[in-house]
Structures are given as structure tokens and as C-alpha cells.
């Protein structure tokens, strides 16, 4: 799901304004990522997905649309050619129960450092697998956006829920059930790709 972007930066003259926000003790920019030209030149403004390094809600990767910048508090994943199916299928794998299990074996609960995400293995996908997973992610996003279309404070707002042409389009329970089915298929696919069986997840939770 792509969230509303509630923070913006003035990039009219590049990172100069951000560089001017310094730590009073060191005199250096508060976020060192702004001092890395390679990051600015090679990664800013590209599509990808991000996650929270620390979260009590569990590991969750979210879409990062084009024309965004990021800092160390919100690490970001990119694909070499910014290819849509590559990004979406990878997001599916990283949001699977199998991937979360592998991450949980390496870190304390609620802590998801970039190094751990980087060294957690990702299975190789066939063209058909990549295409199917990308379709599932797009479908889940579309369902969530459908709900946001009736939320007046959302960037996706279209009309009040009472005016929805089809009641199911704005029914949170129906949408949640459909999204759960999508997640179940993603989880089953990821389990097979990693060579796990369903019991492996239950055994680890015990």
C-alpha cells in the first residue's frame, strides 16, 4: 500500500537547504544521508519500497513512489532497472510470512535493521512467478485504494462512502477478506520457493 506523503522537502535548489540544518554540537547536517552524493545522484526520486527500522506492529514493506527522498530512519529497497514487475514481486516476497520468519531468526522483535534485510536470502523467481506475484500486489493495492477513495482526508478520495456505486467497494470487511486471500496465496508461494512447509511457521511461533 502506498501511504499519503505527509512530509515534503524544498528541493528547488537541490539539497542545500537540508545541508543547512545542522547539529549544533558537530556543525554537520543532522542526517548524514544528505552528505552522500552517490545516494542523492543514484537513488533519490526512484520508485522502490521502504520499511520502518523499528516497529511494534511487525515488519511491513510499503511502496515508495517516484519523486521521493528518504533518510536513514526509513531505509529503502530498489531494483536495478526500476522494472515494475521486479519491484512488485520482490515486495510480495518481502511481505511474506516466510521472509519475516527468516528475519526474526536474526534480530530482536521489533527491530529491522537494513543489514539484516540485505543479508536475508531472496528466492529466484521465474517469469510466471514474478508476473503472478506482481498481479497479486497490484490487486491488494487496488482494494486498499478502493477504501481510501471514500476517506475525505486521503489523496485517493473520490466520493463519500454513501455514494459508492457498489456497497462492497466501500465495505472494509469484504476488502479485508479479499486482501487476506491474496496474502495467503503470497505466503503459500513464498513457502514453496524457500522450501518450507506450513508447519515450519507454527513450529517457530511455538
PLM regions: where:
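Polybasic, glycine- and aromatic-enriched phosphate-binding surface used to engage nucleic acids
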Residues: 1-135
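Non-catalytic DNA-recognition/assembly elements of restriction-modification systems
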Residues: 121-206
Amino acid at each position: 500500500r502506498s501511504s499519503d506523503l505527509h512530509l515534503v522537502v524544498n528541493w528547488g535548489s537541490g539539497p542545500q537547504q537540508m545541508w543547512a540544518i545542522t547539529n549544533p554540537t558537530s556543525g554537520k547536517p543532522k542526517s548524514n544521508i544528505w552528505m552522500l552524493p552517490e545516494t542523492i545522484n543514484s537513488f533519490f526520486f526512484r520508485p522502490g519500497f521502504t520499511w520502518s527500522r523499528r516497529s511494534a506492529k511487525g515488519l511491513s514493506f510499503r511502496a515508495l513512489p517516484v519523486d521521493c527522498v528518504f533518510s536513514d530512519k526509513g531505509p529503502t529497497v530498489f531494483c536495478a532497472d526500476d522494472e515494475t514487475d521486479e519491484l512488485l514481486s520482490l515486495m510480495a516476497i518481502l511481505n511474506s510470512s516466510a521472509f519475516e520468519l527468516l528475519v526474526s531468526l536474526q534480530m530482536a522483535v521489533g527491530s529491522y535493521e537494513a543489514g539484516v534485510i540485505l543479508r536475508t536470502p531472496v528466492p529466484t523467481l521465474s517469469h510466471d512467478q514474478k508476473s503472478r506475484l506482481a498481479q497479486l500486489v497490484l490487486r491488494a493495492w487496488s482494494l486498499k485504494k478502493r477504501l481510501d477513495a471514500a476517506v475525505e482526508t486521503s489523496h485517493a478520495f473520490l466520493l463519500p462512502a454513501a455514494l459508492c456505486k457498489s456497497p462492497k467497494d466501500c465495505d472494509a470487511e469484504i476488502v479485508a477478506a479479499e486482501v487476506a486471500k491474496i496474502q495467503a496465496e503470497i505466503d503459500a508461494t513464498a513457502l514453496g520457493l524457500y522450501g518450507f512447509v506450513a508447519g515450519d511457521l507454527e513450529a517457530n511461533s511455538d
